């Protein structure tokens, strides 16, 4: 099975280490353009753009990067309860047209009650999912060209319609991740691709089976994806040393404060991430080559695959054997790590690579000329 590999745009910040300004770098448009262009050239299928008050706006970032990329797709957030589903449908169609069919959408219900209250959304966990189901039903039908009347508990529209359709027909694909029963019910009814964070394979297999069964009960099939960090090096020893180095500036107080902040979330997925490490740094390898160190201070995706190219590829294939065809990777810092993943991991996987753009120059990778005259010796990529 060919795998669809995405990268990640760190609009919330980037650097060499977690939890410190040491080695940090400014994440401006120039830097984001570098990462997007690298992902575009290296063969990543798309980039996930995060959402929330700690991030730059994902829609504006995506729109700004359309002109500087050629094939890269942009996975941006839909926020039920924060924006009207009909307005979101118009925005989605416009982004799809402006990008010539390179827009993808990620339904994000939110998991931080404090942040949601600041955005004017005062619904509990169950109510948010009720509203998200209503939002998605309207959004999908409007994008597909229907004139929609809808009278729900949380949302009501009359005569909602779209005059300018998207490029992708009947509409751009919808992605979504969530671990609660309500989230799985939503995925089974509404989305094309269900995402999970990087839990151990047995836990992921259980979630996939549950969503697959619920989707089948509605006569639907759902694809599956996973969100993971990657620390890949030429040797396993180098990779584990890089993992240790990434959290080398973290102290116990920083970890404790981060975990206390994340504990207020009512997201089941976030609770499952936190349970993998328990806020302790002594047992971070929670499954073979699956390292939970990132989650000590980072919300959301908190695990990384660690190892050399063949080792990480073997772990990726374990997830693929469960039915996952889409992998959304990231690594710190994101520019350099995009190259490492492409150079050290891609050769060991069957990756769906977008067609390379035509160029007037010699773009085959061959290194630097020897003595200004001799082509370097070729090395097999297998």
Swiss-Prot record:
Catalyses which reaction(s): an alkanesulfonate + FMNH2 + O2 = an aldehyde + FMN + sulfite + H2O + 2 H(+)
Gene designation: ssuD
Keywords: Flavoprotein, FMN, Monooxygenase, Oxidoreductase
CDD domains tied to this protein: Alkanesulfonate_monoxygenase
Family: Belongs to the SsuD family.
EC number(s) given by UniProt: 1.14.14.5
InterPro entries (UniProt xref): Alkanesulphonate_mOase_FMN-dep (IPR019911), Luciferase-like_dom (IPR011251), Luciferase-like_sf (IPR036661), SsuD_RutA_monooxygenase (IPR050172)
Biological role stated in the UniProt entry: Catalyzes the desulfonation of aliphatic sulfonates.
Protein name: Alkanesulfonate monooxygenase
